[in-house]
């Protein structure tokens, strides 16, 4: 465990994670300073009186005088103020690094462009089904520092590329990069390989690396080695097996579960299940209880979630599809009896939308594009696209045209922040309108 006594500590970013960092240091007899670029950041009213704070920007004087900066994942290491501090020799970490220095139980670490939250939650459910005292969080749910507990037997963490950039002490018992597709390109000026390099940090010092056999970008830089276990649709140690119209999860040649016993549906969710099973096996969770968890897990909100089924029309809320790869996963292998009414739009974060084009063929699909990058998305196939300012306008436009057998799918391929507070609010608005219009 690290010693922070007599250290001048500055925390950048409040909110729940920032407050967890403040509590962490106060519990160790260190009073940090806190700064936030927002004028009234969430959690400001919960800061103890003795903690100095600076809001509405960064305080370069504090940063340069610090021994340790704990930076929120929301601020880029390339920010001039952080670059100057780093050049002056100030150590810069994130909350995950603080956590890794303290955690005594094994850690399962999960990253990737898509599916992270589902796989993280699934592995957590597998551990609970086995009676293991598990802490689940990180980039979802509770901040990692709030999970620390001497009685924990296992930690399961979802980690973003931003969190991994400031983490060097992670020694995961099992780690995975589920997939790598363009996301956050506004934070990675050198492109996909720079983003990938941040993700691959999860494998450093890991005992077992769970890689995606269908995505070469998930392999460690030096290639697969004896630490690697693979999952995939048709290839890998953990893969899908299709026979006589049935689909099975298969492990090293052995059928272990028929997918019809799972509550989750869709090929992308079946591969998420394989990844979760590989991680659970890697840390010694009993196979029987892991498979039991797969049969009871109903999925997460806003992730290909059935919002309404009425008059033969299914309205699907996949608002968590905040990047192109996530929407590709939703469309890959999707079966619709009638017409697919696809809602796309929001803030594309400088992404290339062209990989979506191959899923937008045929005469049984209509596009409704909205938000900041609606025009770019409509340009993928203009003859079947209609562009509106807002998602609500798009839904009111399509509603009179849906027929039994159709599907209305919100899988926007974009972030929501141009028009919504977050992807959850976007999904809630979709669900409310589906119930009104359906």
Curated annotation (Swiss-Prot):
Its EC number is 6.3.2.9. ATP binds at residues 112-118. It is an enzyme of class 6 (ligase). One of its GO terms (cellular component) is cytoplasm. Pathway: Cell wall biogenesis; peptidoglycan biosynthesis. It is found in: Cytoplasm. GO terms for biological process: cell division; cell wall organization; peptidoglycan biosynthetic process; regulation of cell shape. Keywords: ATP-binding, Cell cycle, Cell division, Cell shape, Cell wall biogenesis/degradation, Cytoplasm, Ligase, Nucleotide-binding, Peptidoglycan synthesis. It comes from the Bacteria. GO terms for molecular function: ATP binding; UDP-N-acetylmuramoylalanine-D-glutamate ligase activity. InterPro entries: Mur-like_cat_sf, Mur_ligase_C, Mur_ligase_C_dom_sf, Mur_ligase_cen, MurD. Its main location: cytoplasm. It catalyses: UDP-N-acetyl-alpha-D-muramoyl-L-alanine + D-glutamate + ATP = UDP-N-acetyl-alpha-D-muramoyl-L-alanyl-D-glutamate + ADP + phosphate + H(+). HAMAP family: MurD. Belongs to the MurCDEF family. Cell wall formation. Catalyzes the addition of glutamate to the nucleotide precursor UDP-N-acetylmuramoyl-L-alanine (UMA). PANTHER family: UDP-N-ACETYLMURAMOYLALANINE--D-GLUTAMATE LIGASE (PTHR43692:SF1). This is UDP-N-acetylmuramoylalanine--D-glutamate ligase. It comes from Salmonella typhi.
